[in-house]
A protein has these predicted regions:
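Extended acidic, Ser/Thr- and Pro-enriched interaction/regulatory segments
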Residues: 2-94, 102-473
C-alpha cells in the first residue's frame, strides 16, 4: 500500500507538533546491532520526496497506488496514534452545554476550529501507514479548562469550565474562555481500527458518558499530486464526523471535511492550506453552517481566512452550498476570521463588517494539542499501534534508517502475504471492534468487543483477549 495513502484525508498532512503527544510514546530503546546513520537534512528530504511524487503526476488517486517511502522520510509515529479529532477535547465535551439550538451550533464551531490544532502548531510530515486490523485506543480522564496555563504532559487534565457562547437569548459572557466554575472531572474514551486495506479506511468512535456526547466516522483519503502541491480530500467512505448529543434527544451533527493542500515543495518549506467549503448540519434543530476557506489574499499572500454563515435550512431540501446563496431572512449568525489565529461571529443577518459587536469563537494562539493517555505497552495487543510499530520506531529514533526500512518492508510483505492467503481461501477479513469495514455508511457501529474496549477505557482496565486471527502478521 502506498505510504502516501494513510487512512484519513488529513493524515498525509500530519505534523510534528505532537511528536511526543502520548503518555506511552512510541519511543523505546535504540535497537542494537546496527550503526547510527547520518540523518538527511530537510533539503535532501524535500528533493527525495518531490522526486518520488513527480512519478505520479496525472495519477487520479495516489491512495490507490502501491509504493513505499524510505524510513528516513517518515515521522516515527503510527497514523492511528497520531490522527484523531481531539487535539482539544475540552471543546468537544462542551458542544451540548447550551440550552439553545444556536448555542450548540456555535459549540460545534468552537470544536471544529480546534480539532486539528496540530496543523496550526506544527510542520507537515508523514507518519506510518496503518495496517489492516491495527488499532489504537485512548483513555482520558479530564477536567477541562481551555486556557489552562500549565498543560500536563501525560494526560488530558483540564477543567470542564467552557461557557456557552452568546446567543440573542443568552446573557453575555466577557470572553469565550470565561470559567463556569464547576471544575467537573470527566472521562473521554477513543478507539480507532483500520477496517479496510483496499481502499484504506479506518473507523473511529469517541465517547464521553458523563457529558452525554459521542462521535464516530470513517477516515479515508483521496490524494492527487498536481506538480507543485498535493491535494487531499475525503474519500468516498469518509462522510465526515457524526456527533450525537444523547442528552438532547440524540441530536446529531454532521461535520464534513474540506480539501486540504500540502505545498511548499519548491521553496523547501512545507505548509498546509485549505481552500474549500465544508458544512455542519443538524436536521433536528434545522440549522446549518457553511464555512468557506479562502487561502490566498492580495498578490498571493496567504491569509488563511475563513468566512461562514449559520442559517435555518430545510433538511429535506438541502441545496444551498455557498454563503452568497443563503437568504438573508434565514441567517442567524455570520462568521469570519483566520483559522490559524482568531475566529469571530456576529449575531443576526447584517453583513459581518457592519455589526459593531463581534464575539470570539476561538483564539488558537495560546492553545496546544493536549497529550493523551494510552494503555501501558505491556498491556497492549500485538496489533495495537505503538507495539506493532515499536521496532520501526526505535530504529528511526536511533537513526538506523536502513534497519528501519528493512523492518517496514518486512511488515508490508507480511501483510501482502496474509492478504494473498485470505484471497486464496476466499475469506473476507472482518474488523474486531467495528461491525463492518465501511458500513453502516458514514456511521460505524461498535461490535460487542468494541463496546467492551470502550468500557474498559472508562475504568482504566486495559487488558483485552488476543485476536483469534491477525490480518498483517
Amino acid at each position: 500500500m502506498a505510504d502516501l495513502a494513510p487512512a484519513s484525508a488529513a493524515q498525509s498532512l500530519s505534523t510534528t507538533a505532537s511528536a511526543s503527544n502520548s503518555t506511552q510514546a512510541s519511543r523505546a530503546t535504540t535497537p542494537t546491532g546496527a550503526p547510527a546513520e547520518k540523518p538527511p537534512d530537510d533539503s535532501s528530504k524535500f528533493k527525495t520526496f518531490l522526486g518520488i511524487l513527480r512519478r505520479f503526476i496525472g495519477v487520479s488517486d495516489l491512495a490507490a497506488v502501491r509504493f513505499s517511502l524510505p524510513a528516513q522520510l517518515l515521522e516515527p509515529r503510527p497514523n492511528l496514534e497520531y490522527w484523531h479529532y481531539l487535539d482539544r477535547p475540552d471543546t468537544f465535551i462542551s458542544i451540548g452545554d447550551s440550552d439553545e439550538d444556536l448555542g450548540r451550533m456555535l459549540g460545534c464551531l468552537r470544536f471544529w476550529f480546534t480539532k486539528d490544532l496540530k496543523y496550526v502548531k506544527g510542520k507537515p510530515c508523514k507518519p506510518y501507514n496503518s495496517t489492516l486490523g491495527e488499532f489504537f485506543r485512548v483513555d482520558t480522564t479530564a477536567s477541562y479548562n481551555m486556557l489552562a496555563a500549565d498543560i500536563p504532559q501525560c494526560n488530558w487534565k483540564i477543567e470542564d469550565t467552557h461557557p456557552t457562547l452568546k446567543t440573542p437569548n443568552s446573557a453575555p459572557s466577557s470572553r469565550a474562555s470565561s470559567v463556569k466554575g464547576d471544575n467537573k472531572t470527566v472521562t473521554v474514551s477513543y478507539i480507532t481500527e483500520q477496517t479496510s486495506h483496499h481502499p484504506p479506511v479506518s473507523a473511529f468512535y469517541v465517547d464521553c458518558p458523563e457529558k452525554g456526547i459521542s462521535a464516530r466516522g470513517y477516515d479515508q483519503l483521496s490524494a492527487k499530486f498536481t506538480g507543485t502541491s498535493v491535494r487531499v480530500s475525503a474519500g468516498a467512505h469518509n462522510l465526515g464526523i457524526f456527533i450525537t448529543l444523547k442528552n438532547r434527544d440524540n441530536e446529531e451533527y454532521q461535520l464534513t471535511h474540506p480539501a486540504a493542500y500540502l505545498g511548499g515543495f519548491l521553496r523547501g518549506t512545507l505548509n498546509v492550506s485549505v481552500a474549500d467549503s465544508c458544512y455542519i448540519t443538524c436536521p433536528r434543530t434545522g440549522l446549518k453552517t457553511i464555512l468557506e476557506y479562502q487561502e490566498e489574499g492580495w498578490l498571493g499572500r496567504s491569509q488563511n481566512k475563513v468566512i461562514g454563515v449559520i442559517f435555518k435550512y430545510d433538511s429535506k431540501n438541502d441545496n444551498i452550498t455557498k454563503v452568497k446563496d443563503v437568504p438573508e431572512k434565514d441567517v442567524l449568525a455570520r462568521i469570519e476570521g483566520c483559522w490559524q489565529d482568531k475566529v469571530y461571529y456576529t449575531l443576526g443577518s447584517k453583513p459581518f463588517n457592519k455589526v459593531p459587536e463581534k464575539h470570539l469563537i476561538i483564539d488558537v494562539n495560546p492553545l496546544e494539542p493536549i497529550p493523551k493517555i494510552v494503555p501501558p505497552l505491556e498491556e497492549q495487543l500485538p496489533n495495537e499501534s505503538l507495539k506493532f510499530w515499536e521496532g520501526v520506531t526505535n530504529a528511526i529514533v536511533g537513526k538506523q534508517y536502513t534497519l528501519a526500512t528493512s523492518l517496514k518492508t518486512e511488515i508490508e510483505e507480511k501483510q501482502r502475504a496474509k492478504a494473498a492467503e485470505r484471497k486464496a481461501a476466499d475469506k473476507e477479513w472482518k474488523p474486531r471492534f467495528f461491525t463492518g469495514s465501511v458500513t453502516p455508511i458514514g456511521r460505524p457501529d461498535l461490535t460487542p468487543d468494541g463496546e467492551e474496549a470502550l468500557r474498559g477505557l472508562h475504568v482504566e482496565k486495559y487488558q483485552l483477549p488476543h485476536n483469534k486471527e491477525y490480518a498483517a502478521f
